[in-house]
Swiss-Prot record:
ATP binds at K14, H210, L211, G212, N213, G214, D284, L285, R286, G332, I333, G334, E335, H336. Its cofactor is Mg(2+); Mn(2+). The lineage of its organism: Bacteria, Bacillati, Cyanobacteriota, Cyanophyceae, Acaryochloridales. It catalyses: acetate + ATP = acetyl phosphate + ADP. Keywords: ATP-binding, Cytoplasm, Kinase, Magnesium, Metal-binding, Nucleotide-binding, Transferase. This is Acetate kinase. Mg(2+). Can also accept Mn(2+). Pathway: Metabolic intermediate biosynthesis; acetyl-CoA biosynthesis; acetyl-CoA from acetate: step 1/2. The record marks H184, R243 as: Transition state stabilizer.
């Protein structure tokens, strides 16, 4: 079976192709082909394609989104990165869909009803669901009636306990769909499964730290999400690359009274806050650490604030679980920043958590970096959302 995975965003398309023969393997299979399309402005994009044998890089000018994606897909069966003979070899296409609302608690085959539901949820995910829906429609145009599967980022959190899901506003907010949904669910679910594989056992109490440009924590009890830091939107929770995370809602009322409108507040909180907003340097923690080395006080404040908020939110997840048996770090920062892991774990030393400093500095993938005598295991996991989407497609089709 050949499975194409499409992760369509507002400014990029990421795709990969998997070939699965026989039963699903126990470990993630490497893709046959990977491609990324990044938009620099509405008519200009850059394309990168990677296969085992060849790499391809191109600049695309004066092209529509549909034409650019069509060109990207043709590199599957044409040119130096060809890995299949024709488009008809693709059996199924899986899509990451950020918001599935209350109705979609697992992956589903895309139908007209599903497309309508994704469109109806655009007000809850205006930066993501439109691009996800566009990706589905483009595949329909380019690949005809190939089966498509929607894999929802909210699904893993769809069974949150009421006390974790309901906001303490008016009770009728629930009828409006205003509740905690949680995000990064594909990553959190993958890490939950991968943790059990690495340790060779199920885990009772697990906290997953997905730390990238977007960041979230999830408390997992016996394989089920019971609390998570992102909420009604991916804006809630931790301080992130450009997002503020949780702030006093009274600040927004204050700014509205000063004349700010919804679009200005949206941009401020989603694009001009977080590490970028505080440091004035970058959303990238690596660049912030370079600025700190040059005695940039604002950059140091941004990093200190990032870690303070991370530790505070970890405390919340810890209380929801009543302790922790395994702590997982994933995402770009989680996987690669030994210093963030070390400083975070130092705050949990009272639990008997001890890192192996040598292993931590090596940032090993899919390994336990806790000391032998640590009472809490600490794993670094390379999240593989694309593979998780491919797994969902396989399960829908077999």
């Amino acid at each position: 079976m050949k499975i194409l995975v499409l992760n369509a965003g507002s400014s990029s398309h990421k795709c990969c192709l998997y070939a699965i023969e026989g039963p699903l393997p126990d470990h993630p299979a490497p893709p046959l082909w990977e491609a990324q399309l990044d938009w620099h402005d509405p008519n200009h994009a850059s394309l990168k394609v990677k296969t085992k044998r060849e790499n391809l890089e191109e600049d695309l000018s004066d092209v529509s989104r549909a034409d650019a994606l069509s060109h990207l897909l043709t590199t599957l069966w044409h040119g130096p990165t060809q890995v299949i003979q024709m488009a008809q070899e693709i059996n199924v296409v899986g899509h990451r869909v950020v918001h599935g609302g209350q109705d979609y608690q697992s992956s589903v085959v895309v139908t007209s009803e599903v497309k309508t539901a994704i469109a109806d949820l655009i007000p809850l995910a205006p930066n993501h669901n439109p691009a996800n829906l566009e990706g589905i429609k483009l595949i329909e145009q380019l690949l005809g009636n190939v089966r498509q599967v929607a894999v929802f980022d909210t699904a893993f959190h769809s069974h949150l306990p009421e006390v974790a899901a309901i906001y303490p506003g008016p009770y009728d907010w629930q009828q409006q769909g205003i509740r905690r949904y949680g995000f990064h669910g594909i990553s959190h679910q993958y890490c939950t499964q991968r943790t059990a594989e690495i340790l060779g056992r199920g885990v009772d109490r697990l906290i997953i730290c997905h730390l990238g440009n977007g960041a979230s924590l999830t408390a997992v009890k016996q394989g089920q999400s019971i609390d998570t830091s992102m909420g009604f939107t991916p804006l809630e929770g931790l301080m992130m690359g450009t997002r503020s995370g949780s702030i006093d809602p009274g600040i927004l009322i204050h700014l509205m009274r000063q004349g700010y409108d919804a679009d200005q507040l949206d941009h401020m909180l989603n694009k001009a806050s977080g590490l970028k907003g505080i440091s004035g340097v970058s959303h990238d923690l690596r660049e912030i650490e370079q600025a700190i080395a040059q005695d940039n006080a604002q950059a140091k404040l941004a990093r200190d604030l990032y870690l303070h908020r991370l530790k505070a939110c970890l405390g919340s997840m810890l209380m929801s679980l009543g302790g922790v048996d395994v702590l997982v770090f994933t995402g770009g920062i989680g996987e690669h920043s030994a210093s963030v892991r070390a400083e975070t774990c130092e705050a949990l030393a009272f639990l008997g958590l001890k890192l192996d400093p040598i292993l931590n500095r090596k940032s090993p993938v899919d390994q336990d970096i806790a000391a032998v005598d640590s009472k809490v295991r600490v794993l670094v996991i390379k999240t593989q959302e694309d593979w998780a989407i491919a797994q969902s497609c396989y399960e829908q089709c077999c």
